[in-house]
C-alpha cells in the first residue's frame, strides 16, 4: 500500500511492502530512512562497525525455511569479517581477505594509518575495489589510468608479503628470484 510521510519540505512517497516477518517501508529517493519517522539519513556505514548487524535470521520462523542457508559475501576486510563469522557457521565465500591475515587482527591502537575515504571521522563506504589500497594516495587515480600505473605498468603484479614487508615484493608470474620482466 502507498505511504505518505510529511517532512519539513513536503511529502515523501513510499510503499509498505510485505516480507516474511511483517512489512517494510520503502521511501522513494530517501536512502536509509527510518520507518514511520521523518526521513533522515543515518550515519554513513553505521553497520560497518559491527558486521554482525548485517546478518539477520527471522527468529521464531526458522522452521518455515526448512534448510536455512545464509550466504555471506565479503571482499578484502569484509572477507576477513566473513571468515570470522565462520567460527559459528558451516560455509562462506571469501574474496581477497582472510581472518588469519595479520592486518585483520590489528587493534585500533596499533593501526598506522586510517582507512579512506573518511568524512568527518566516519568511514564512508564506496562501491568499487579497484586499487582500493591506493585510494586517496597522491599520484594514483580511481577514475583513469594514473601516472604511476602508466610509468610502472606491472605495479599491480608485484606481491608484497605482509609478514615480511621489507622483502622488496615478489612478482606474481615467472621466476620469483629474478627481476620482473
UniProtKB/Swiss-Prot annotation:
<dbReference type="InterPro" id="IPR029058">
    <property type="entry name" value="AB_hydrolase_fold"/>
</dbReference>
<feature type="active site" description="Charge relay system">
    <location>
        <position position="132"/>
    </location>
</feature>
<dbReference type="Pfam" id="PF00135">
    <property type="entry name" value="COesterase"/>
</dbReference>
<comment type="similarity">
    <text>Belongs to the type-B carboxylesterase/lipase family.</text>
</comment>
<keyword id="KW-0770">Synapse</keyword>
<keyword id="KW-0472">Membrane</keyword>
<feature type="active site" description="Acyl-ester intermediate">
    <location>
        <position position="76"/>
    </location>
</feature>
<dbReference type="GO" id="GO:0045202">
    <property type="term" value="C:synapse"/>
</dbReference>
<keyword id="KW-0531">Neurotransmitter degradation</keyword>
<dbReference type="GO" id="GO:0005886">
    <property type="term" value="C:plasma membrane"/>
</dbReference>
<dbReference type="GO" id="GO:0006581">
    <property type="term" value="P:acetylcholine catabolic process"/>
</dbReference>
<keyword id="KW-1003">Cell membrane</keyword>
<dbReference type="GO" id="GO:0005615">
    <property type="term" value="C:extracellular space"/>
</dbReference>
<protein>
    <recommendedName>
        <fullName>Acetylcholinesterase</fullName>
        <ecNumber>3.1.1.7</ecNumber>
    </recommendedName>
</protein>
<keyword id="KW-0719">Serine esterase</keyword>
<dbReference type="GO" id="GO:0090729">
    <property type="term" value="F:toxin activity"/>
</dbReference>
<dbReference type="InterPro" id="IPR050654">
    <property type="entry name" value="AChE-related_enzymes"/>
</dbReference>
<keyword id="KW-0800">Toxin</keyword>
<comment type="function">
    <text>In venom, its toxic role is unclear: it could result in less musculatory control by rapidly hydrolyzing acetylcholine, or that it works synergistically with alkaline phosphatase (ALP) in paralyzing prey through hypotension. In muscle, it terminates signal transduction at the neuromuscular junction by rapid hydrolysis of the acetylcholine released into the synaptic cleft. In liver, its function is unclear: it could serve as a safeguard against any diffusion of acetylcholine from synapses into the circulation.</text>
</comment>
<keyword id="KW-0964">Secreted</keyword>
<dbReference type="GO" id="GO:0003990">
    <property type="term" value="F:acetylcholinesterase activity"/>
</dbReference>
<dbReference type="GO" id="GO:0019695">
    <property type="term" value="P:choline metabolic process"/>
</dbReference>
<keyword id="KW-0378">Hydrolase</keyword>
<feature type="region of interest" description="Disordered">
    <location>
        <begin position="162"/>
        <end position="181"/>
    </location>
</feature>
<dbReference type="InterPro" id="IPR002018">
    <property type="entry name" value="CarbesteraseB"/>
</dbReference>
